[in-house]
Amino acid sequence: MITLQNVVKEYTSRNNKVLAVDHVDLEIEQGEIFGVVGYSGAGKSTLIRMFNGLELPTEGSVEVDNLLISQIRGSKLRKARQQIGMIFQHFNLLWSRTVAENIAFPLEIAGVRGEKRRFRVNELIRLVGLEGKENAYPAELSGGQKQRVGIARALANNPKVLLCDEATSALDPQTTDEVLELLLDINKRLNLTIIVITHEMHVIRKICNRVAVMENGKVAELGDVLDVFRHPKEKVTQRFVRQVTDSDETEELIHLLLDNYAEGKIVKLLFMSENATQPVISQVAKENDVMLNVLHGNLTQTQNGAYGTLYVQVLGTEEAIEASLTQLRQLKVETEVLER
């Protein structure tokens, strides 16, 4: 669906050169929700603007739905952009137009007239849950409602791709989740390819199938969201994963557990996918004659599946404890004995 090959974007001023995107290769499949996460200045917004030709690469090629966006200009590019919707952090609505008129704007530009345009606008208002707000102006809407207008406007011409550039960064947590649920619903209903640019790992965890982590213009890490959360390889990825896993709190928790539970062994268990929801603990305890005391745990859901972390106190003989850990590993549960 979308292919980036050796894409470079360089900005040149009188005194220096800035390499915003540094030799990026990506393949994004039809119908997937693909996340790009990075801190400010990582190059992610520059990258997404090359998907619809708002920025042109200095080197390399950008192909969307078998069309080389990086090589077309003028009317051909304008026509191609009708198939690539985009929503923004600050909504970019026309403040003198109502909700319905904002949604109708791209249809007007595309030459859609009369009853056909009105039907499409009403259809989109229902899709994004804005019934009753048709004649409201942007100043009368909440942040979440404004973004829903932005989403409806971006979908007006039935695009195949939706670009989301920090689309939830200006929203509160509850509204963020509501907008993300809407994007998930639209993705499933329309089989729409969605590219999400964000600096919030919660957004990636909630809706994305795969993620690229960017740093200094490069893709530092790429993979399924579940794999990246479970085994982040690069330091920048580990920092992002800590946004969701609260590792500083975990470090404090480990010291607390080791200080307060002196008997037996304290073990960290990592469950994946189907094992995250199965009664593995009770099975292992029963079959190996050990006591497993659950001290702390959490379960994290992603679009690829769930993974869970448990901290347990294992009580029994040395042989029984070792046998229980061996069985857990055989059941594809990762184990880590915490050292005192």
Swiss-Prot record:
Keywords (A to Z) from UniProt: Amino-acid transport, ATP-binding, Cell membrane, Membrane, Nucleotide-binding, Translocase, Transport
Domain ABC transporter: 2-241
Localization in the cell: Cell membrane
Catalytic function, reaction form: L-methionine(out) + ATP + H2O = L-methionine(in) + ADP + phosphate + H(+); D-methionine(out) + ATP + H2O = D-methionine(in) + ADP + phosphate + H(+)
Recorded superkingdom: Bacteria
UniProt cross-references to Gene3D superfamilies, sorted A to Z: 3.30.70.260, P-loop containing nucleotide triphosphate hydrolases (3.40.50.300)
Transmembrane segments: none
Top enzyme class: translocase
Family: Belongs to the ABC transporter superfamily. Methionine importer (TC 3.A.1.24) family.
Protein name: Methionine import ATP-binding protein MetN 2
Gene: metN2
